[in-house]
Amino acid sequence: MKTLFVLLGMFVIYPCLYAQDAELQACREELVRGMSQKNRDSIAAAYCHLGEYYAYRQADSTRYYCEQGLKYAATDKAEPYLYLLNNLADAYFSSGQLDESLKRFRFVLEEAGRLHWDEVEIASVLSSVGVIYRRKEMPDSALVCYNRALALLDNREAYDERTQLLTSIAILYTNTARLKEGEYYIRKALEVSEKSDDMDMVMYAAATAGSIFTLRENYAEAAQLLYPVLAK
């Protein structure tokens, strides 16, 4: 029976590993093509994609590929230049280097203004800055960033970004013992998440809501919360 469970586990894991290997191979081939064509835009984009591949796997690799990509990226247009800058700042955050990450996210915002980047992307950067301030125990500064981001997303169908942002605000209020405000914002996040196609964001909001409802001693709703999420 133990052997059967091991084999079943392998059948589940192998397709995932194969998909990851295929994605990585595609990124490498993209870089080779860009190099062979000596196309700086293509090379920068390929390095950007490699950095994104490693974003949740290995922060050091993401930093390396972003730094390489910035050597080729044109600085007079938003993409992939701003994505490389943003991913590099995020890699520093993932490594726990909050001050360096904050400095680099601020530079992203400066360059985003210069290049007139999409407001949804700018809102995402502001949200990241807010998270850093929250981690640095600077709740007022975090809230300023979150509110600026919310204003940019107003009347936009950016459901994934709004879900993440509202959840971050709920966490901020909860961490400062303002549970009533935390519950208000997490309910708004849950409402928006119903229109989101990003299951990670949906689960993020649901898990946070469960914790907040538990702190509010709303155990019944906390227990029932995951059922509709798992049914999606």
Q: Which functions belong to the PLM regions below?
A:
Residues L4-I13:
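Sec-dependent N-terminal signal peptides
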Residues C16-K232:
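A "functional boundary" signal
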